[in-house]
Design a protein with these regions (language model features):
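Conserved histidines in hydrophobic membrane contexts and catalytic metal-binding motifs
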Residues: 1-320
Length: 320
């Protein structure tokens, strides 16, 4: 718990710290509806193709926080790095309002030490720097921590009933600090239990979502292999328009373009969120590169709890 607390504290303010530490980051815009951001897809695609002719666009993800489209790219003929939506890989930002481009690989840091520190805090917090083994170990320790907190309340609560909650005695310094300890431990224990429970679910979500995406990919391949495909190819904005027409009440939170290995557009759709920073659970929807009926693979029912736990765990310092 001490490790998770020490590493989690700077991560709470990762966005603010990274914004301060990146000296050439474009100014952030105001929040913007995802549908308005997607309206800039044709212009963004053209701008990226013109400015980076040697790059191939793999996926596009909107950021409702500041009205930006993230184009995940790779060198033509090259290999794409590990990535997920706006995380990882080579990402080119397109500011919809101004039409400006910024390649995130060209970021200049005020302090490389701060950047390295934040990266270290992240990998320690999520997996102890040990990949999946470290992640699973942290989940197991969180389970033990919750058991310890709950059992501690059960064991010590009867002994504390003789004293009203919040009472601070001043007869001696030992009693004074003991009462403060009881008061703060009630809040700290509750917070620790919430963070541990939500953290365990995040690990389960990570495993479950990976399995869901693999299953969805297999189901989509089988579904479209049994159909005759059109020889013509949809432009990204045409594929997007079909999805918006098919799912008008949903937000489109990601779009992956067809590749040599898969002639399918892969979209993630989600329920609209209250805030731009809220987590949105993506449901996989596939569309043939030549158009046709979309193929939706529902998310397992238990994964629908993910938004509650991830919003509780990650952006909990945002009170507005």
């Amino acid at each position: 718990l001490l490790l998770l607390t020490l590493t989690g504290l700077p991560l709470l303010f990762r966005g603010e710290i990274n914004a301060w530490n990146t000296v050439n980051l474009p100014p952030r815009g105001e929040p913007m509806a995802l549908s308005e951001i997607w309206a800039g897809l044709p212009q963004g695609t053209a701008a990226v193709a013109q400015a980076f002719p040697t790059k191939e666009i793999l996926a596009v993800t909107p950021d409702g926080e500041d009205g930006t489209l993230y184009f995940r790219v790779k060198d033509r003929g090259g290999k794409a790095g590990r990535s997920h939506m706006r995380m990882g890989g080579e990402q080119i930002m397109y500011e919809v309002r101004t039409g400006t481009l910024f390649n995130r690989q060209e970021r200049v840091y005020r302090s490389e030490a701060v950047q390295e520190f934040m990266h270290t805090m992240h990998i320690l917090h999520v997996r102890l720097g040990l990949e999946e083994g470290g992640r699973d170990f942290l989940a197991a320790m969180c389970v033990l921590s919750v058991i310890s907190i709950v059992s501690g309340v059960y064991l010590y609560l009867p002994m504390m009933k003789t004293l009203a909650f919040g009472t601070r005695r001043r007869r001696s310094s030992r009693l004074f600090w003991s009462d403060w300890h009881k008061l703060t431990s009630a809040f700290a224990g509750t917070w620790a239990a919430l963070m541990c429970v939500s953290g365990v679910f995040i690990v389960l979500y990570s495993v479950g979502m990976r399995d869901y995406q693999r299953t969805a990919q297999t189901m989509a391949a089988e579904h479209f292999s049994a159909q005759e495909q059109s020889a013509s190819l949809l432009l990204p904005e045409e594929a997007l328009a079909q999805m918006q027409e098919a799912f008008p009440a949903k937000d489109i939170i990601s779009m992956r373009l067809p590749t040599a290995d898969s002639a399918l557009y892969v979209f993630q759709i989600a329920e609209p969120t209250v805030r731009a920073t809220d987590f949105a659970l993506g449901t996989q929807v596939y569309l043939a590169a030549g158009g046709g009926e979309p193929f939706l693979v529902p998310v397992p029912a238990w994964l629908t709890m993910a938004p509650f736990f991830l919003n509780l765990h990650i952006p909990n310092h945002e009170l507005t």
